UniProtKB/Swiss-Prot annotation:
Subcellular location: Cytoplasm
InterPro entries registered for this protein in UniProt: LysR-type_TF (IPR050389), LysR_subst-bd (IPR005119), Tscrpt_reg_HTH_LysR (IPR000847), WH-like_DNA-bd_sf (IPR036388), WH_DNA-bd_sf (IPR036390)
Domain HTH lysR-type positions: 6-63
Classification lineage: Bacteria, Pseudomonadati, Pseudomonadota, Gammaproteobacteria, Pseudomonadales
Sorted UniProt keywords: Activator, Aromatic hydrocarbons catabolism, Cytoplasm, DNA-binding, Plasmid, Transcription, Transcription regulation
Name listed for the protein in its UniProt record: HTH-type transcriptional activator NahR
Molecular function (Gene Ontology), one example: DNA-binding transcription factor activity
Keyword DNA-binding: yes
Gene3D superfamilies attached to this UniProt entry: Periplasmic binding protein-like II (3.40.190.10), Winged helix-like DNA-binding domain superfamily/Winged helix DNA-binding domain (1.10.10.10)
Length: 300
């Protein structure tokens, strides 16, 4: 069909439905009634001769044709919005914006307390939302603006993304403060003689630790596997297990959980923690402000 035959206001509803996946939420975000959103979707379906969205228990899922339209429509909407708001400024003191950051639970433990304390003074009405996404969904989320920044070791975010180094992370051995292993220097032999907690942090670079130890022939006695780091402090304080964790997490856990962080007997590769954002939002004033704040607070 010809573009002149399409009511472009319908694409605003389409674009918001791509993000919200629920008619009620889209109506609220656009300041419309639910019947108005439903009617707009009905008209767009008729114009494009495609269902566009199919109702599921997880919300409105886009059809293949809607998914095909998603990127160009989102890009066009963002370009138009930027053009219309070109002369507007971002004032953190009065803004009520919600910023969405993708990070692991380590990131939440390490970054959030300090960031939220500063935001209480510099941007008291702003909201922070954290998410965890797979590499592919994260790429799309950064591209369409549902995620503002991603923080971590994310080697798949390259083409189309900017990045900036925040800090370096090295690994230590974490255990309870009165653990027998703390009585003498931690050798590789003693390290391997105790049971271990292994954290399988899917979608992050921390799996490289296991890969490296396997490659150099180090075999730990794995007694427990967990999918995230948040439980490690609770587990170690009441067991004789050891855990290999990044120093930034250890710094946050030692005092609250009564733990000791020991130099690791294995020389493990350091990991770089970077901050990523999509090229489309490189000049977005709010994004620029948040990036600079993160850099000022956390860069080594």
């Amino acid at each position: 069909m010809e573009l002149r035959d399409l009511d472009l206001n319908l694409l605003v509803v389409f674009n918001q439905l791509l993000v919200d996946r629920r008619v009620s939420i889209t109506a609220e975000n656009l300041g419309l009634t639910q019947p108005a959103v439903s009617n707009a979707l009905k008209r767009l379906r008729t114009s494009l001769q495609d269902p566009l969205f199919v109702r599921t228990h997880q919300g409105m899922e886009p059809t293949p044709y809607a998914a095909h339209l998603a990127e160009p429509v989102t890009s066009a909407m963002h370009a138009l919005r930027n053009a219309l708001q070109h002369h507007e400024s971002f004032d953190p003191l009065t803004s009520e914006r919600t910023f969405t950051l993708a990070m692991t639970d380590i990131g939440e433990i390490y970054f959030m307390p300090r960031l939220m304390d500063v935001l209480a003074h510099q941007a008291p009405n702003c909201v922070i939302s954290t998410v965890r996404d797979s590499s592919m969904s994260l790429m799309q989320a950064l591209q369409n603006g549902t995620v503002d920044l991603a923080v971590g070791l994310l080697p798949n975010l390259q083409t189309g993304f900017f990045q900036r180094r925040l800090l370096q992370n090295h690994y230590v051995c974490l255990c309870r403060k009165d653990h027998p292993v703390t009585r003498e220097p931690l050798t590789l032999e003693r390290f391997c003689s105790y049971g271990h907690v292994r954290v399988i942090a899917a979608g992050t670079g921390h799996g490289e630790v296991d890969t490296y130890m396997t490659r150099v022939g180090i075999r730990r006695d794995i007694r427990l596997e967990v999918p995230h780091f948040a439980a490690v402090g609770h587990i170690l304080q009441r067991t004789d297990l050891l855990a290999t964790v990044p120093i930034r997490l250890a710094d946050c856990c030692v005092e609250p959980f009564g733990l000791s962080a020991l130099p690791h007997p294995v020389v493990l590769p350091e990991i770089a923690i970077n901050m990523f954002w999509h090229a489309k939002y490189h000049k977005d004033l709010a994004n620029i402000w948040l990036r600079q704040l993160m850099f000022d607070l956390f860069t080594d």
